[in-house]
Every structure is written in structure tokens, then in C-alpha cells.
Amino acid sequence: MRHRVGGRKLQRTASHRTALFRNQSAALIKHEQILTTLAKAKELRPYVEKLITLAKKGGLANRRLAHARLQDDTQLKKLFEVLAERYASRNGGYTRIVKAGIRASDAASMAIIEFVDRDVSAKGQDSGPVETDEDVAEAA
């Protein structure tokens, strides 16, 4: 019987789900807003909120617990230094999920998950290689 067994499988193996939540939580901490499916956003929310609660408590043991779940040193630093201070006076509810319509290709419900009181300038920050005019000239 599966009484009180929570969480969605999202048609993935356990290791794939773990990797998915690690990557999405790192992206959310970095950009403070990401677009994903509604089901993934609903599963990601408690994962990230527990990380912020660990960061608010501080300490070496909590930092190691957060690192075990996140495994991204730069985002871990931002989590403990920036986000923990930002949400020090807030008791939970650090994220919000906003429905973003239907994806055209497969009709999946999309959603934006973002931090409450987020830094608007963090969105799209260093999101990959950027082509410069020199790169375009060399390719031609």
C-alpha cells in the first residue's frame, strides 16, 4: 500500500529526479525566476524552501546538508549570504508559482516559479556563452 507516500515521479528514475531538482534549484537560486512545467514547479517549491530554511539557520552542519542537496558552490554561497539575509524576517513562503499558460508543442501546463521579493537584475544573468561581434566575424 502506498499510504502517505508523497511526491510526483515525473516519469523519471529516482536518480534522474534528484538531478532534476538539483539543477532546477541551482537555476532558481542563480536567476531567481525560472519557467518550467507546473508539476515540476510544484515539486521544486518545497525542495527550495527547505534549502532556504537551512541557510537561515546557518552553521557548518546546515551548510553541509544544503551542499549535499544542491552541489553547486557558487549558488550555495549566494543561498547562505544573500537569500538567508533577505528572508531572515520571513517565516516560510519564499517562493511563488505563477501559471504561464500552455506550451504549444505538447499542451503542458507551464508555470513560472520565482522568489518573493526577488532581485529583478538576476534574471538571465550569465546564462551561457554570448556571441560577440568578433565571434560572428570569425565565423563568416
Swiss-Prot record:
UniProt protein name: Large ribosomal subunit protein bL17
GO molecular function: structural constituent of ribosome
UniProt similarity note: Belongs to the bacterial ribosomal protein bL17 family.
Pfam families: Ribosomal_L17
Protein's GO biological process: translation
PANTHER family reported in the protein's UniProt record: LARGE RIBOSOMAL SUBUNIT PROTEIN BL17M (PTHR14413:SF16), RIBOSOMAL PROTEIN L17 (PTHR14413)
Annotated PROSITE patterns: RIBOSOMAL_L17
GO cellular component labels: cytosolic large ribosomal subunit
Subunit structure: Part of the 50S ribosomal subunit. Contacts protein L32.
Keywords: Ribonucleoprotein, Ribosomal protein
Superkingdom of this protein's organism: Bacteria
